[in-house]
UniProtKB/Swiss-Prot annotation:
Source organism: Sus scrofa
Residue runs in coiled coils: none
Membership in a protein family: Belongs to the cytochrome P450 family.
Residues that, per the record, bind heme: C451
Name listed for the protein in its UniProt record: Cytochrome P450 4A24
InterPro entries: Cyt_P450, Cyt_P450_CS, Cyt_P450_E_grp-I, Cyt_P450_sf, Cytochrome_P450_Monoox
Gene: CYP4A24
UniProt keyword annotations, A-Z: Endoplasmic reticulum, Heme, Iron, Membrane, Metal-binding, Monooxygenase, NADP, Oxidoreductase, Transmembrane, Transmembrane helix
Alphabetized Pfam families for the sequence: p450 (PF00067)
Catalyzed chemical reaction(s): an omega-methyl-long-chain fatty acid + reduced [NADPH--hemoprotein reductase] + O2 = an omega-hydroxy-long-chain fatty acid + oxidized [NADPH--hemoprotein reductase] + H2O + H(+)
Gene3D superfamilies membership: Cytochrome P450
SUPFAM superfamilies recorded: Cytochrome P450 (SSF48264)
Regions crossing the membrane: 6-26, 112-132
PROSITE patterns: CYTOCHROME_P450
Length: 504
């Protein structure tokens, strides 16, 4: 290479280096200004000292994130600032008055966190915002009409009995049992039969086991990614081991939902079947989506349809499985309440061969225990919002638009200012006529974006608890105490292990 050419190349390299340095300086200035804006915006909300780079993130890298959360709830009234890292901060909210103000508004969900779910569940009802969300919610609400939910009770009972039959065989060999896995298969079986017109049994289908494992992997990977500044970048994440594992798990989940959609489409194409469905006064969840797709053309794309199926396949089984598992653990840990529930159910159902819609409102003490367990172990431990306009709270503190709020349902349910002796299992908190704040108990979130399937979930929990207590006496396994951890839903790091004894 000639001297002039070398000089030219050297000059270009210097220019490129200067441009790169300039871009780095501009980015650093941008991050600095954003941090200063956050510091000013959050100055009314104290928090423990945070590191300038990694914020409070190390505080939440422990075996369980929940003890550090509860320390904050006790120390800082109503809300506190939480720094994930240097330029990522939010306000953690755990006060019912604050919750009421936030949930009365229409702020969107926090895009920074929820966008990480898109490769898994797409832009369905959980992730949509604004008018699109409103239209989709209105379209799907009829799928949860009480006339639709009534016959589901029988289907729920059949799925629960299949699970209990398996348990009876297992505990004949060993009374110790991990329950989250089989409960998840049972709730998947239930949602597929009720909402997706599935004729088989997810509890005996090998593909369903693969789907359940994929969901567990996806939840864990989502939790890992939300805590890592490095993995926020989509390109870096796709190239990382976690990203590749996430891609494989999402593919398995999508294959499962695609099979469900194609099977129902094939059934509807049989002669006369479509006409029979159209004559129904109320349609189930998947039929509403398929008819909207077939009859309204582009109003619901194939991508939209799959996103809703992915969303409800997950939400319709996993959150309920979490709820049922923790309820059974709570009752196992408090045998006096377990026995009182059993006596109530025996008086109502006798031999337990059948349970109907009408029975569900006739088990008040069992319902109180279910609600108290949901207070202690809310299936969805938190939701988040991104302020679209300034907000002022009842105590006069305020925040500007653009701030992220993390509404900690777990923190709210364990707030000693809201629930005296919050770690104590006390079903009398939910006795008929007992007074509490309208936003003190939110196992299904609240406001206009509350869980669309909350009545479905509550019915399934009652059916599962009632039939289980009629057949088994439950006790905790003291050698394997569960370690609660929030991963989209409230999981246990080491499963939920019980000891079961078949009742005579």
């Amino acid at each position: 290479m000639t001297v002039p050419a070398l000089a030219s190349a050297s000059g270009l390299l210097q220019v490129a280096s200067l441009l790169g340095l300039l871009l780095l300086l501009l980015k650093a200035a941008q991050l600095y200004l954003h941090r200063q804006w956050l510091l000013k915006a959050l100055q009314q909300f104290p928090s423990p000292p945070s590191h300038w780079l990694y914020g409070h993130s190390r505080e939440f890298q422990e075996e369980s994130e929940l003890p550090p959360l509860l320390k904050r709830v006790e120390k800082y009234p109503s809300a506190c600032a939480l720094w994930r890292w240097g330029t990522r901060a939010m306000v953690l909210v755990y006060d019912p008055d604050y919750m009421k103000v936030v949930l009365a508004r229409s702020d969107p969900k926090n895009s920074v966190v929820y966008r990480l779910l898109i490769p898994w569940i797409g832009c369905g009802l959980l992730l949509l915002n604004g008018q699109t969300w409103f239209q989709r919610r209105r379209m799907l609400t009829p799928a949860f009409h009480y006339d639709i939910l009534k016959p589901y009770v029988g289907l729920m009972a059949k799925s629960v009995q299949v699970m209990l039959d398996k348990w009876e065989q297992l505990v004949a060999q060993d009374p110790r049992l991990e329950i989250v896995g089989p409960v998840s298969l049972m709730t998947l079986d239930t949602i597929m039969k009720c909402a997706f017109s599935h004729q088989g049994s997810a509890q005996t289908d090998g593909d369903s086991h693969s789907y359940i494992q994929a969901i567990w992997d996806l939840k864990n990977l989502f939790s890992i990614r939300t805590k890592s500044a490095f993995l926020q970048n989509d390109i870096i994440y796709r190239l990382s081991p976690e990203g590749r594992k996430n891609h494989r798990a999402a593919r398995i989940a999508h294959q499962h939902t695609d099979r469900v959609i194609q099977l129902r489409k094939a059934q509807l194409q049989k002669q006369g079947e479509m006409e029979n469905v159209r004559k129904k006064r109320h349609l189930d969840f998947l039929d509403i989506l398929l008819l909207a797709r077939m009859e309204k053309g582009n109003s619901l794309s194939d991508t939209d349809l799959r996103a809703e199926v992915d969303t409800f396949m997950f939400e319709g089984h996993d959150t309920t499985a979490s709820g049922i598992s923790w309820i059974l653990y709570a009752l196992a840990s408090h045998p006096e309440h377990q026995q009182r529930c059993r006596e109530e159910i025996q008086g109502l159902l006798g031999d337990g061969t059948s349970i109907t819609w009408d029975h569900l409102d006739q088990m008040p003490y069992t319902t109180m225990c279910i609600k108290e367990a949901l207070r202690l172990y809310p299936p969805v431990p938190g939701v988040s919002r991104e302020l679209s306009k300034p907000i002022t709270f009842p105590d006069g503190r305020s925040l500007p638009a653009g701030i992220t709020l993390s509404l900690s349902i777990y923190g709210l349910h364990h707030n000693p200012q809201v629930w005296p002796n919050p770690e104590e299992f006390d079903p009398s908190r939910f006795a008929p006529g007992s007074a509490r704040h309208s936003h003190a108990f939110m196992p299904f979130s609240g406001g206009s974006r509350n869980c669309i399937g909350k009545q479905f979930a509550m019915n399934e929990m009652k059916v599962a608890v009632a039939l289980t207590l009629l057949r088994f006496e439950l006790a905790p396994d003291p050698s394997r105490k569960p370690i609660a951890t929030p991963e989209v839903v409230l999981n246990s790091k080491n499963g939920i292990h019980l000891k079961l004894r078949k009742l005579p």
